[in-house]
Amino acid sequence: SGCALRTDVRRSTVMRRLAWDAPEVNEEWNCDKGRFAFPYTSEGRLTHPLVRDSDGNLVPTSWPEAIRIAAAGLAATGSATGVLTGGRVTVEDAKAYSVFAREVLGTNDVDFRARAVSDEETAFLANHVASKPLDVTYGDLETAKSVLLVAFEPEDESPIVFLRLRKAALKGNTKVYAIAPYTSAGLAKMKGTLLTAGPREEVAAITNAAAHLTSDSVILVGERAGQTPGALFAVAELAQKTGARLAWVPRRAGDRGALDSGLLPIGGRSTSEILAAAGKCVKGLLIGGVSPEDLEGDLVAAVESATFVVSLETRHTEVTANADVVFP
């Protein structure tokens, strides 16, 4: 999910962010998050490549020198390198990371998920989402007979989806159901129906939701479902049983593009496994735009343990503070 935006710049200064001319996506409207929630224009951005000198300090250097040092270090770690990209890179960058990791470094230890992950989620994404057509559009949400929300809060996680569902519900076109422990403010605004499910009750609630779905329905499942054992498999089975269309809605804008570009660790280690193996089986780390806050203390500990670390970032973090080479 996401919206089409344009950024107006004058004299190297961002003046405003407006909805792009793509009415089929966001009807020429963009949410407050899209308009204001971006930090890349704030002060403190990195402007030059940095390398660690003989005294252990990060110092500015030229691009050719930084590339030379990074290439030598990654060549040394080779297939024992883990690649973590985060979910905010473009499709083109995601593809470049994937090809570089698998064909140049010779590693399958790649993952775009900057959060807690599970084997069930990996299998679900590989079998039911990756390389599948995007057959659920924003317009489809307004014409669906019913929409089931599983581990997904549209108002908080995807305001454009919320706007469409609220619009459809107020017109009486679509009935919204949500599997959750309580009725959220967003669900109330969509005149939705709560299918109550407390801890360890989600899988049963998903199975029982079949009574509210038909082939004209849509199931929207959020990334939080991956933290409930059995939930994603139950969702896939529900979609197959009812004929409802299924859409996975992650929180980060680049997650789906990264998934389709090959940044799921098929045959390799997941994010949590890469971090746990840092300094052991995983000697090197290539990290692109993953914030320490996303993975609490695990990421910093892994960076400190690794033999060689390359970081691509917009500004200094605890990752860049411990990296051997930093690219802005």
State the predicted function of each range.
Residues S1-P328:
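Catalytic alpha/large subunits of respiratory electron-transfer oxidoreductases
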